[in-house]
């Protein structure tokens, strides 16, 4: 059976992670109104469809150069493009003000001529993408097919019916790229922690924070999963924000993270968090123990 990797790309907050979650009927990928929630390209479980094994790769959204994680995100996008067969571009219909950025980002994609290209228009809140904007994107992107959906009221059957019209082809030049696996325990643990940092801390911190599993063990007699995790940030001021007055913030983050993990695991969970600083000159992965 042929294996196809589909990279889901687009502007930040276009609905890329939401689409992949909907197709898997799961919430493994973190979704947030914050820009660039996804920092690394993430692989998901394989879906068997029409005699093909399809793996969706959730790719970080296009960002502007002034973004603190611009270099990391750009690197991840390039890595993803070299390791996929199909490029699925998601465009949200109400993001007209971001279309100039999108069209700028589409120019470098022209060199990836061997990828099957599909344009998916997310009709957000039933807002229709203006005809001239749609035409401009089609001219730049040159998709083999244009699909439309509303991810807030997603109909998987309708999506697959449209998708069946696309002739998916393996890319003979695809590299054997290794992506983060969204279905592993370690990824779920670190994403649960990152979700709380996004929820409770300023927008600057989630993009520079580096997370690591220092120790993980299971006490079978007590049915207890013990987690010791490290949160690293480049500035002392950011460390103080995460810790909070009388350590109230880091306690809240740990408690809410534990509640999230209880949805995954049929056992008790103990979480201990350490907050430290790292030298910003050192290039550290957002998920130190997974790379």
Curated annotation (Swiss-Prot):
Topological type in the membrane: Peripheral membrane protein
UniProt subcellular location: Cytoplasm; Cell membrane
One Gene Ontology biological process: ribosomal small subunit assembly
Binding residues annotated for GTP, in chain numbering: 10-17, 58-62
Record bears the keyword Repressor: no
One GO cellular component, as annotated: plasma membrane
A Gene Ontology molecular function term of the record: GTPase activity
Cited Pfam families: KH_2, MMR_HSR1
PROSITE patterns per UniProt: G_ERA, KH_TYPE_2
Disulfide bonds: none
Domain Era-type G: 2-144
Annotated ranges, domain KH type-2: 201-279
Record keywords, A-Z: Cell membrane, Cytoplasm, GTP-binding, Membrane, Nucleotide-binding, Ribosome biogenesis, RNA-binding, rRNA-binding
Family that this chain belongs to: Belongs to the TRAFAC class TrmE-Era-EngA-EngB-Septin-like GTPase superfamily. Era GTPase family.
Subunit structure: Monomer.
Purpose: An essential GTPase that binds both GDP and GTP, with rapid nucleotide exchange. Plays a role in 16S rRNA processing and 30S ribosomal subunit biogenesis and possibly also in cell cycle regulation and energy metabolism.
Protein name: GTPase Era
